[in-house]
A protein has these predicted regions:
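Short hydrophobic beta-strand element within catalytic cores of glycosyltransferases
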Residues: 91-94, 104
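A conserved nucleotide-sugar
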Residues: 6-52
Length: 172
């Protein structure tokens, strides 16, 4: 979908490669923008560093093998993809939109940027991809955050309390 800004991922990869960082982009998912992203990769001469795998039933397999997750969306309600990556010890490079700032702590569990700021996202990606110690530490903090804040034994009581408050207000 256009709001996910997959072409930004290709632009970010091009900038990271220009900085001399050896890496590749694995893009998971199908949608109306996939062909445009593939076309942009060809135009930039980086198609060979991109793998477009389409929709996948087990995203965790790809997240577990990733160094970073790029999430340059212009809209994001909660940020489930970010949370899934964090649970796999993968730092998230994302737009500062929707629920993402609630999930990703800038500079601690990932990096947040304004929507469309591919230069900053590329700089963040290049730094994390070229500094294994920093990437590993950020990934560990990401996992700790995901587990401590979003475990079922933490979240379910919060939902129960919320619904009890709603029901109590309706009874009055």
């Amino acid at each position: 979908r256009p709001v996910k800004r997959p072409i930004d991922c290709v632009e970010i990869l091009a900038r990271v490669l220009k900085k001399g960082v050896k890496t590749r982009l694995i893009m998971v998912g199908d949608g109306s923008e996939r062909q445009n992203a593939e076309h942009r990769a060809r135009c930039l001469g980086i198609y060979d560093q991109c793998t477009f795998v389409g929709k996948q039933p087990r995203i965790v397999d790809y997240l577990s093998a990733s160094d970073v997750l790029l999430l340059p969306s212009e809209q994001e309600s909660f940020g489930l993809a970010a949370l899934e990556a964090m649970a796999c010890e993968v730092p998230v490079i994302a737009s500062r939109v929707g629920g993402l700032p609630e999930v990703v702590t800038d500079g601690e569990t990932g990096c947040l940027s304004p929507v469309g700021d591919v230069d900053k996202m590329a700089a963040d990606a290049a730094l994390l991809l070229s500094d294994e110690k920093l990437r590993r530490e950020m990934g560990q903090r990401a996992r700790e955050s995901a587990i401590s804040r979003y475990r079922t034994d933490v979240v379910i009581p919060q939902y129960i309390e919320f619904y009890e408050q709603v029901i109590a207000k309706q009874s009055v």
